[in-house]
Amino acid sequence: MPHWLILDAGNSRLKFGLWDGHRVHATGAVSWSGDWPGELDMALAAMARPERVVVGSVHQTATVEALEAISRRRWGCPLTRITTTAAACGVQNGYRDYRQLGVDRWAAVVAAHLRAPEAWHLVIDVGTAATVDVVGPRGDYRGGAIFPGLRLLADALGSGTAGLPSLAGEAVPLPARSTPDAIRGGVVHGLAGALRHLASEMLPAEAVRPRRWLTGGDAGRLQPLLPQGAVWAPDLVLEGLAQLARESG
């Protein structure tokens, strides 16, 4: 049974988990702000030496080199970097230029497809950006859409207004009866509405009983506002990175 450390270097956080050949467990995350190498070292302190360390990164080379230095210092283990390809794990990349597709989105659609290869899949990932991707039966990745996430929407509003409230807490009912609640409710419900519309536009008529997957750091907050049947899959990207690494040898 493999014992791999999987790293997802996203825009806001570094997510990690252990892959045992079947599922991801012992997951965690550290923010890029502050002393992230020290925080990661502490988070991994009790971990047994992994057989392999795998990373998918939306960042440039410097971040990957820093992660490899940590891996070599702690375990003497090199890093396997996963990148987007034209095809992998039975999925054909439908982008005109496959290199433009972020590796996190690629990993998520690969993981979704491998869970049910004969089904249509809609993958909604709500992090710094919100993405919606569609993959059809037999691994036909159709493409997707990108939309600002909760914090980006709030920041855009805050750049032109004063007293931006915290987005923490549950989504407030609308119509709101205070300006902070109106902003919070508008951002949260607005993003949920955009995602519902994108999902309905992107699934073709022949997509009967599609599987809907919800992942990303802010996805849990939006789940009650999205169509029923969306399955919360917080480790979908990590799972996909592990599957891509397994195929790469």
Curated annotation (Swiss-Prot):
Gene: coaX
Quaternary state and interactors: Homodimer.
Alphabetically ordered keywords of this record: ATP-binding, Coenzyme A biosynthesis, Cytoplasm, Kinase, Metal-binding, Nucleotide-binding, Potassium, Transferase
Molecular functions (GO terms): ATP binding; metal ion binding; pantothenate kinase activity
Stated role: Catalyzes the phosphorylation of pantothenate (Pan), the first step in CoA biosynthesis.
Highest rank taxon of the organism: Bacteria
Family according to the record: Belongs to the type III pantothenate kinase family.
Species assigned in the record: Alkalilimnicola ehrlichii (strain ATCC BAA-1101 / DSM 17681 / MLHE-1)
Pathway linked to the protein: Cofactor biosynthesis; coenzyme A biosynthesis; CoA from (R)-pantothenate: step 1/5
Residues of the active site: 104 (proton acceptor)
Required cofactor(s): NH4(+); K(+)
UniProt binding sites for K(+): 125
EC class: transferase
GO CC terms of this entry: cytoplasm
Cofactor note: A monovalent cation. Ammonium or potassium.
Documented EC number(s): 2.7.1.33
Reactions it catalyzes: (R)-pantothenate + ATP = (R)-4'-phosphopantothenate + ADP + H(+)
Residues bound to substrate: 95, 102-105, 179
Protein name (database record): Type III pantothenate kinase
Pfam families the record matches: Pan_kinase (PF03309)
Subcellular location: Cytoplasm
Gene Ontology biological-process entries: coenzyme A biosynthetic process
Amino-acid positions noted as binding ATP in the UniProt annotation, renumbered to this chain: 8-15, 128
